[in-house]
């Protein structure tokens, strides 16, 4: 499964484009985000990507979960958003 890492500084339109391309190619993608700002950007990107794939008759859903990741040698809890067609 392809993993996209989103930060507070990520451009939602850019993330949405990548997300839509991966959904079309592989049918599933995982987005990882740490912190409220990053999660906000990720959710905006999912909403934008839904608009990108809708004209082709597809709809996407998002399943949230927690995951532990390592950043600079430190364990952090992240939100992972599994995005896939409905």
Task: Walk through the language-model features, giving the residues of each.
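Low-complexity, interaction-prone regions
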Residues: 1-2, 86
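Conserved mixed alpha/beta catalytic, RNA-binding, or beta-rich assembly cores of soluble enzyme
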Residues: 2-28, 42, 46, 50, ...
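Short beta->alpha linker loops
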Residues: 10, 34-37
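Short, hydrophobic/π-rich interface segment
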Residues: 36-60
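C-terminal edge-of-domain segments
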Residues: 54-86
